[in-house]
Amino acid sequence: MIKRFIIIVALLTTVASAAQEGTSSPYSFYGIGLTKFKGTVENQSMGGIRMFSDSIHLNLRNPGSYGRLKLTTFTVGGSHQSTALKTDNDSESSRTTSLDYLAIGLPTGRLNFGVGLIPFTAVGYRILENNDETSNRYTGRGGMNKVFLTAGYSVNDNLSLGVDVNYNFGNIQNNFTTLQRGVQLGSRQINRTDLRGFNLNFGLDYQRKLNDNLKLYTVATYAPQMDITTERMRNIATLSFRTDGSEVVIEENDISFPQGDLSLPSEITLGAGIGTNNKWFMGAEYSRISASDYNFNSGNSFAEVQYDNASQYRLGGFYIPEYNSLTSYFSRVVYRAGLRFEETGLNLSNEGINEFGISFGVGLPAGRSFTNANLGIEYGQRGTTNSGLIQENFFKLSISLSLNDKWFVQRKFD
């Protein structure tokens, strides 16, 4: 199984290398970029909810779920997204492909562990602004990733607690080039920010039987506000342009800024749901993010930008016709659906940037073990055309593999 896992990771990494920015959203222009979904395809296909956990799947959104893990589990996931962007006067389209997560969970008894890599934010935009006097071009790339170590402890059959220790790292580059009409030379400004530092996320997973058929699921997670280190540099250059549009640097100057801090906002999530083992589940969650405490300066300075506290509302679930059917493969398939609404906290020209998504997915049994492939689709909308802003309509196709095995087995010899 390990060899299969390595081959799969290599293939997905090769595919994802075609577009590692992970986004083409103009809204990634602001702050440290667009926040990436931090969860598995299984989570995403149910509106992003984090409360459901079992013994054979990793739940990257709730460290408390690791206490229920019974098998060593590898999971890897990637996605392809098509986006249509429009304003009141124009429209464009874009596509991105990315590797979304890579993780392993290791059960050792009541105390279980996990380790993995997942994107935190992504920057990827290209904006052209032309008028009678100037021609401006804004481009950006990069983002922040996190390596995480998770520990989850099963207190009893009902309660499990856990913590994520995340090391965040990455860099963001924002470029601005301007050329004035009738002037031979132009100017370019490159702002690069390197980011690194730790943050924590605590999770509680509580499940209890209500009767012989129904089970109650509840979840609570909390990530406290923590600071990470930033190092910023600026390159200012005078340019000339060849006939093919390429740049020639005439003169340039590097400016270094003092080391600073970025406050990652606190986040709290509460959720509850009900279901029947191996049959169906439905749940709802609410998250509150203190984005108004955000204090990052990337070199992009706009008076009409501010951050408000963010909220997320999620609803989702799954249905399995007959999980142990011997005659029908599709009766053993897990059918998932969900929806979400997010107030992102980003406020431009007094317009809050909101996001909506509706998702569907399937979990496909593969082989004799608990190994499964997961497919998910999401259609969503971000932003608005009000106040001269941009509305994005996106379609996302996600795929993941979850491979299970049993390690640390004491072998018996005759």
Cite the ranges covered by each PLM segment.
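Subset of outer-membrane beta-barrel
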Residues: 20-414
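N-terminal signal peptide c-region/cleavage motif recognized by signal peptidases
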Residues: 13-16
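Sec-dependent N-terminal signal peptides
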Residues: 7-9
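Positively charged n-region of N-terminal signal peptides that target proteins for export
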Residues: 1-5, 208
